[in-house]
Amino acid sequence: MVASDSRPMRLRLRAELFLASFAVREESIRSKKEWTYISKYIKGILKSRLSRREQSRWNIIDDTTSMAFFEEFASLNPVFHTFLFYGRRDGEDLSFHIVGFFRLSIRGYIFFLWESF
């Protein structure tokens, strides 16, 4: 059994991958050094949490296929996008969290997103 077979781990994986796809889509990763870091980080997430069959399904080989994965992942998960940009939790406006996104580390924001479920 791989870690992604459990529901909590799948949810956490989805949150992490969404965050990564958001960072790339919004062009917050501007330099080649930053892109190399985030690319390795994302591939590490995918390879450590997905089974070999799941990895082959997404064809995680290089940066181009990784970007295709991000685009497909984002299209499959509009709930995360809606939550981040338009959602309210207990009447709280979450827009300030989006502004803060660019000041937080990837791991720090994943923690925020995970704790907000």
UniProtKB/Swiss-Prot annotation:
Protein name (database record): Uncharacterized mitochondrial protein AtMg00970
Keywords: Mitochondrion
Extra remark: A stretch of 270 kb of the mitochondrial genome is duplicated within the centromere of chromosome 2 resulting in the duplication of the gene. The expression of this duplicated gene (At2g07676) is demonstrated.
Cell location: Mitochondrion
Organism for this UniProt entry: Arabidopsis thaliana (Mouse-ear cress)
An annotated GO cellular component: mitochondrion
Source domain of life: Eukaryota
Main location, first listed in the record: mitochondrion
